[in-house]
C-alpha cells in the first residue's frame, strides 16, 4: 500500500505580494514510523528545521547547522511511503520506511528514493524520563530518474 502526502503549494497574491508560499497544515505525529517521517517533511515544508531535526534519535541526529543548511534552497517537498517493515525484539521496536521524495528547490526539482530506519524502546518498558518516542536512526536517499508517482525506495531492517 502506498500513501501520498502532499505538502506546500504556491499561490499568487495580487498587488502588494507578487507571490507567497501557502503554509502546510502543522503535523507533529510520533505515533507510527510513517507518521514520524511525514512529520519530518511537514516541518521541512514549513521551514521549521529545529522541529524537523527533533524527529531524529538524539544519538544519531545530524549536526543541526549542517541539517538546516542542507535545506537552504528547498521550496517544497512531497513524500510517498511504501509498506513499513516492523519488528520487535528485546524491548525495542524497529521500523524501516521506504520513501519517494520530490524536492522543489530554487534550481528545479528532483526525485529521491530511499529508506528511513526508526526505533523506539517499548513504551511500556520506559520508566524514567524523558520519554523516548519513535525516532529516526538513519536515512539514506539517492536521486532517481523514475517519476515521483511511480518511484519508491527499498528497505530492510539492517
Where are these regions (language model features)?
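Exposed beta-sheet edge and beta->alpha loop/turn motif
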Residues: 90-158
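Positively charged n-region of N-terminal signal peptides that target proteins for export
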Residues: 1-4
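Bacterial N-terminal signal peptides
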Residues: 6-14
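Sec/Tat signal peptide C-region and signal peptidase I cleavage site
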Residues: 16-20
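Short solvent-exposed beta->alpha transition segments
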Residues: 23-24, 28, 34-39, 49-94
Amino acid at each position: 500500500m502506498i500513501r501520498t502526502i502532499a505538502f506546500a503549494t504556491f499561490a499568487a497574491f495580487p498587488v502588494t505580494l507578487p507571490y507567497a508560499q501557502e503554509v502546510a497544515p502543522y503535523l507533529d505525529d510520533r505515533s507510527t514510523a510513517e507518521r514520524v517521517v511525514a512529520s519530518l517533511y511537514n516541518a521541512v515544508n514549513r521551514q521549521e528545521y529545529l522541529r524537523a531535526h527533533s524527529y531524529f534519535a538524539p544519538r544519531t541526529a545530524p549536526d543541526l547547522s549542517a541539517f538546516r543548511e542542507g535545506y537552504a534552497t528547498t521550496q517544497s517537498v512531497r513524500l510517498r511511503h511504501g509498506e513499513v517493515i516492523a519488528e520487535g525484539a528485546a524491548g525495542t521496536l524497529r521500523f524501516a520506511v521506504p520513501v519517494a521524495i520530490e524536492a522543489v528547490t530554487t534550481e528545479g526539482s528532483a526525485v529521491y528514493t530511499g529508506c528511513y530506519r526508526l526505533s523506539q524502546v517499548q513504551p511500556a518498558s520506559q520508566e524514567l524520563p524523558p520519554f523516548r518516542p519513535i525516532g529516526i536512526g538513519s536515512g539514506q536517499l539517492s536521486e532517481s530518474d523514475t517519476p515521483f508517482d511511480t518511484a519508491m525506495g527499498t528497505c530492510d531492517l539492517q
